[in-house]
Every structure is written in structure tokens, then in C-alpha cells.
A protein has these predicted regions:
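Conserved catalytic core of the tyrosine transesterase superfamily
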Residues: 1-322
Length: 322
């Protein structure tokens, strides 16, 4: 059955194919909203032959039931599609304005040592589950995948999209090519994590002889965001009661590193810059988000850096945050 049905269907499909080839497509986030836009065009503009400013603006206009963030989520892929068309001179309409991201009061879960021990115990004990219930590739992938998030602070999508060629097992370096904002950066693995990655690679390559992704899914594809969410939830809920998400392992990595700064020799500027770069923040100010997660740290830093604190770490609008 044809997925897209409006007059824009050939262009939409070309856009989706391009995004997939560029490995910047997330079916969960973008697919449903693009289909809704296509159906809107089919129903409201049945005789249209070209995308107009009216069509784009009417769809992207913020609805009464939406806040800025929900509107952003709905229209982002459509604005990206229009940008794609403009670059190829297939339309001359302007890009609709995307509402500014609103601050959220969300506070990431603060993991306890016991919770993390429970979580990784559940991951490791997949090996004891019957093969009929847990495929072999899943039981060996899950413990390594989530330990990588925990030990390196990389984003979940960065781990999902890691190619075999992006992982230097000799030097212990990850080349993060596809990321939030598409900013390339490098991450140095802890020696213990490097050993785990080497063991995993030796085992998984026997099952996937010529895999593209370091953590392969069926059909030589990468794992979906839903795969991460589902498996984290299943492992977490086995022995823990508080709510947590896989992405919060990144928050934990940042705050644990920052907490150590008050106990070690300070070297504030160098440590801040290193943490910012290793976490893939394109601007230094984005790292400031994590200071609000470490009780009392902002005051400590201000005392140690004096008047330069606000110059080094100014207020940010949380556009990049995490």
C-alpha cells in the first residue's frame, strides 16, 4: 500500500529516502507527523499541484491545544522537508517559524548505587533466560549497550547509530559522527569499557559477519529509539520502583563527573571544556545545564572562580541542554 497519498507524495518519499540514507531519520519521531501532514494535504487541498505558503503556514500554525514544545514536535519534520525542497529549488516558499522551545521543570532521576546495581544485574542475567524467550543477540547486546551509555555519557541515538568503523578498539576512541545538531566529536572509552566492547565485538561478529552498525539490528539496520526505551524499561522495572529513562544515564555521567571536581584539584576551565567536548555540546554554555542538577555546586564554583563565573558559564535557554 502506498504510504503517502497527496500531490506531494513523490517529494515526501524522496525526502524520507534522503534522510534515511543520511542516517538522520527517526521513524518514531518523524514518520507519523509526516503522514499526518500528507493526509492533511490530500484532504484539504485535493486539486493542488504544488506546495504553497498557505498550506505550509496553515499546518504549522500553533494550535489552541498545543504548547510550544508539542507544536515543535509536530511541525519540525515538515519544516525540515520544506528546507530540503528549498535547497533543491523545488519550492520558493519560506520556512514557517518553529516556536521557541519552552523551559521544562523536569528534573532527571538521580540514580542510587543500589538502583544501578539492580539494573545491570537484570541486564547481565538475560544470559540465564531461555533462548526461546530472549534471542542470543539481544542478551549479549543489552548489557554492553547500556554500560556504554553509563560509562561514556553519549546520547542514546549516538550509541544506536555507531558504525563499526566509528569504534577504534585499538585506541579506545569513539567517532561520534551523527549527533544532535550533527556535530562530530570524539569520546575516549574507559579501559574497562573498552575491554567489554572488544569482547562484544568478538562475539557479535560471528553472528553478523559484515555488519554496518556496532550494535546491529535485523536487516543490517540500527536499533530504533523504541528498542532502547522498551529494553531499558524491562530491565529497570525488574528490581527498581522509581521512574527512570535510559537518557538519564547521560545526566548521571555528567553530574558524577562534576561532583568529583569539588574533591580533586580544581583545574576548572580545562575540566569544563573537556566535559563539554566529550558530551558533544557545540557551545560551552550548554554544559551549564548540569550545574543545576548538582546541589550547591553553583555556589562552590562561584566562590572558587570569583567574578569570572558568569562569564565562563552564562545563563542559557536550554535550546541544546542535555
Amino acid at each position: 500500500m502506498k504510504k503517502f497519498k497527496s500531490f506531494l507524495s513523490p517529494l515526501i518519499q524522496a525526502y524520507v529516502d534522503y534522510q534515511k540514507a543520511s542516517e538522520r531519520w527517526d521513524e518514531t519521531s518523524y514518520g507519523s507527523n509526516l503522514i499526518l501532514f500528507d493526509r492533511y494535504c490530500q484532504k484539504q487541498y485535493p486539486i493542488a499541484t504544488a506546495l504553497s505558503q498557505e498550506i505550509a503556514d496553515n499546518w504549522c500554525r500553533k494550535r489552541k491545544t498545543e504548547n510550544n514544545n508539542s507544536c515543535r514536535s509536530r511541525i519540525y519534520v515538515v519544516v525540515s522537508f520544506i528546507r530540503y525542497l528549498r535547497k533543491r529549488r523545488k519550492t520558493d516558499i519560506r520556512e514557517p517559524e518553529i516556536p521557541r522551545k519552552e523551559r521544562r521543570s523536569y528534573i532527571p532521576h538521580a540514580f542510587t548505587e543500589a538502583e544501578l546495581k539492580n539494573f545491570f544485574y537484570a541486564c547481565d542475567n538475560l544470559l540465564n533466560e531461555p533462548l526461546s524467550r530472549v534471542p542470543r543477540y539481544r542478551r549479549i547486546t543489552i548489557p554492553v549497550f547500556f554500560r556504554l551509555l553509563y560509562s561514556s555519557g553519549i546520547r542514546t541515538n549516538e550509541a544506536r547509530l555507531l558504525r563499526v568503523e566509528d569504534v577504534d578498539l585499538n585506541q579506545g576512541i569513539l567517532d561520534i559522527r551523527y549527533s544532535k545538531g550533527h556535530a562530530q566529536h570524539y569520546v575516549v572509552l574507559h579501559n574497562s569499557m573498552l575491554d567489554i566492547m572488544k569482547e562484544y565485538d568478538a562475539v557479535i561478529r560471528k553472528q553478523y559477519l559484515a555488519r554496518t552498525y556496532f550494535f546491529p539490528a535485523r536487516g543490517d539496520a540500527f536499533h530504533t529509539r523504541k528498542w532502547v526505551q522498551t529494553n531499558f524499561r524491562q530491565m529497570w522495572d525488574k528490581y527498581n520502583s522509581a521512574y527512570a529513562t535510559a537518557y538519564e544515564l547521560r545526566h548521571h555521567y555528567a553530574t558524577e563527573n562534576i561532583n568529583r571536581w569539588t574533591d580533586e584539584g580544581f583545574g576548572f576551565d580545562a575540566k569544563l571544556l573537556y566535559l563539554s567536548k566529550s558530551m558533544g555540546h557545540s557551545i560551552l554554555e550548554s554544559t551549564r545545564y548540569y550545574y543545576s542538577l548538582v546541589p550547591g555546586l553553583a555556589g562552590i564554583l562561584k566562590d572558587l572562580t570569583g567574578g569570572t563565573f558568569n562569564e565562563i558559564i552564562p545563563e542559557v535557554d536550554d535550546e541544546e541542554s542535555n
